[in-house]
Amino acid sequence: MIKKIISFAVIVSSFFIFNTYLHAATGPANIYKITITKVELCETGSTLSNCLNPVDITVGDGVADVDIAAVTAGESAGVVADFGKGIPGKTYTYVQTILSRSVNAKGSVGSCYTANDAASGTANGYATGTQTSGSEAEVTLLVPDFVDPTNYSMIEGSSDAAGTSLRVAGTVGASDTHFRARKILTTPYTAKAGINPTVFLAFGTSGAIMNKAGTCGSAQTLAAAPPDQTVTIQGQ
């Protein structure tokens, strides 16, 4: 699937980045719905593992079931964050986002297709697929649980949508319902009073379904993999 460019007046999101996790094979998603519950900006001095002086820029309660696989160039997937909430004069270098572990997706990896067989994403993040292409269906997949603080210090699991109870960096647990992820901005953003920049996001879902080792159709092998994503800010 081609990369899609999305233009937002006051929106930004970050997404999980462990696309090499478990070295699993990946395939395209035709449907890929995510839920974003909180977005924060991180001041200069922040790192992948630490958001310095975070400022909450979430609009309302965030957005649910945004299908990033269906959004075409120039369309908005919903307003989730307002850069106007940044503190004037402060410069921000990272964005930090809380997302649901659950992803509604439809797609395949090779000859293994997502299947609505009531065996959707289990607590460890994997679901049973099908080898019959005609049975492909939208299903709930989960971001897999993992422990890898060396390579994924930008991610930590959360037991709630607000991020009030977080695991240590590089860990997502089976009982977590959400996770928090940090991503560096392509260009630092300096907040100015009365000015909201235009934020461009580029999503690609050609590798958004993940398939680990096992027999498709009898073993739980499918999980959500991250879409390609970049954030660019204009009009500062």
Please identify what each model-predicted range represents:
Residues 1-2, 17, 223, 227:
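Generic N-terminal leader/processing signal
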Residues 24-236:
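A short, solvent-exposed, low-complexity linear motif enriched for acidic/polar residues
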Residues 9-17:
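Bacterial N-terminal signal peptides
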Residues 1-9:
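Bacterial N-terminal signal peptides that target proteins for export
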